[in-house]
């Protein structure tokens, strides 16, 4: 049996008539009848008997159907795969990003890109640095955008921006709001400690160690977001990435850079053996502009 024979046989068997099969296949009834006749001629036996206006499968057809159905399901799978490949011509962006970019930078980039290319599909999830490699290897994402990533085997890092750690503090803490601060100026303030904060935490503690700074802390949290929200409630001072700080500004809090600055890279990671699509390249440019 040819593939067309299988398609027509399956349609007639499951719908019960040539009329319904033609509708399901979006072809004419004579076309279905012709293909059925050709299939029966090649097989050397009848597949259906006409009984009171309906086509009833013969015993041979019923024996054949289970195998035909397996092939038909495979054909459907191939068709769906082909549709997905066709859809990728418009573009699919499977993206994992560090949560801080979700405040403004990522929504800004997606909105601008979607306006220009409305047929590109986005699938976005948040990720932490220690999850990036596994997410890429398991193809949960094509691209992971994180802060200051460590070198990973088989992974290429593309620097798309540079940012910095900043202090977030209540405005009442200083008579005039400084544009820059030193760690010495924060001594004595209640410090919100952010545990397990990855490479940015290492960057911060390295500087504090170099300057022999110890900040008093009675509150320890796991995320920059919670730390920033605590400051917004008037509790202490925290040091977070600039994106989290800007995303949580309010009338009563301010931010300041450090002197000297605590810079870090924003990098996009992808597997070395996988070439980025043109849509991903274009989106990275948009994201870089929004950052």
Curated annotation (Swiss-Prot):
InterPro entries: LysR_subst-bd (IPR005119), Tscrpt_reg_HTH_LysR (IPR000847), WH-like_DNA-bd_sf (IPR036388), WH_DNA-bd_sf (IPR036390). Disruption phenotype: The growth of the deletion mutant is significantly reduced with D-glutamate as the sole nitrogen source. Gene3D superfamilies: 3.40.190.290, Winged helix-like DNA-binding domain superfamily/Winged helix DNA-binding domain (1.10.10.10). Induction: Expression is up-regulated in the presence of D-glutamate. Residues 18-37 bind DNA. SUPFAM superfamilies: Periplasmic binding protein-like II, Winged helix' DNA-binding domain. Pfam families: HTH_1, LysR_substrate. Transmembrane segments: none annotated. It comes from the Bacteria. Keywords: Activator, DNA-binding, Transcription, Transcription regulation. PANTHER family: TRANSCRIPTIONAL ACTIVATOR PROTEIN LYSR. Transcriptional regulator that positively regulates the expression of the D-Glu gene cluster (DGC). The cluster includes dgcN and dgcA, which are involved in a deamination-independent D-glutamate degradation pathway, dgcR itself, dgcT, dgcP and dgcH. Acts by binding the consensus sequence upstream of dgcR, dgcT, dgcP and dgcH. Belongs to the LysR transcriptional regulatory family. This is HTH-type transcriptional regulator DgcR. It comes from Pseudoalteromonas sp.
